[in-house]
């Protein structure tokens, strides 16, 4: 059985036991997180939400928090001696999917 959930403005296909990386979730390490925005449940019994499935949840355990690799943003205007450099590291959360409740 698999499910498609929405978190951090993205839709992610998840299976029980899978490790996923999502936008930062405000929960401590080893804490359980519940996602109630379930869009689709597939497998033997298929359920499609319009847009969400009522009563369906996905629970996951927070394994770690971190920051992605640094990206550099450069701004440049020709002939004006204008150069700007800025870096950014996006925070993420690593989750392990525990259970899909249909």
From Swiss-Prot:
Disulfide bonds: none annotated. Keywords: Ribonucleoprotein, Ribosomal protein, RNA-binding, rRNA-binding. GO terms for molecular function: rRNA binding; structural constituent of ribosome. It comes from the Bacteria. PROSITE patterns: RIBOSOMAL_L21. GO terms for cellular component: cytoplasm; ribonucleoprotein complex; ribosome. GO terms for biological process: translation. It holds the Pfam family Ribosomal_L21p. NCBIfam families: L21 (TIGR00061). Belongs to the bacterial ribosomal protein bL21 family. Part of the 50S ribosomal subunit. Contacts protein L20. This protein binds to 23S rRNA in the presence of protein L20. This is Large ribosomal subunit protein bL21. It comes from Oceanobacillus iheyensis (strain DSM 14371 / CIP 107618 / JCM 11309 / KCTC 3954 / HTE831). The gene is rplU.
